[in-house]
Amino acid sequence: MNKKFLVAWLVVFIVMMLGGLVIHGMLLHDEYMATGLMRPEAEQEGFMAWMVLAHVVMAGAFTWIYARGVENKPWLGQGLRFGLALALFCTVPIYLIYYCVQPVPEMLVIRQIAYDLIMMLFVGAVVAFLYRGQGRA
């Protein structure tokens, strides 16, 4: 691990936490509460350490995979492709699987996928910006 990786990991973690807060804590909050599947907000606070740990792991993996595969190509396109690839690999299937096993409205799932896809594209661009000019030829 080098300094660039640690800085990128921290930045990606912050972006993911803030993005998650905006998407799930604000934009989708009322829809989540209407499902009756979520913990009461007071109870959720007791699980915040697990939420932080999940985002630390996710940000570290996201950064590590990108850093290992970055090429000497334009950073923005590379970052957007990376964000899209991870969204298609993780985000879309997870929400579709949840939709199959949990009684959530179809429009909620569509919004989850759309918002998180946008966030993954943005995070891909962020990590690519941080690693610009660092790729292999």
Predicted regions and their residues:
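Juxtamembrane/disordered regions of integral membrane proteins
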Residues: M1-A137
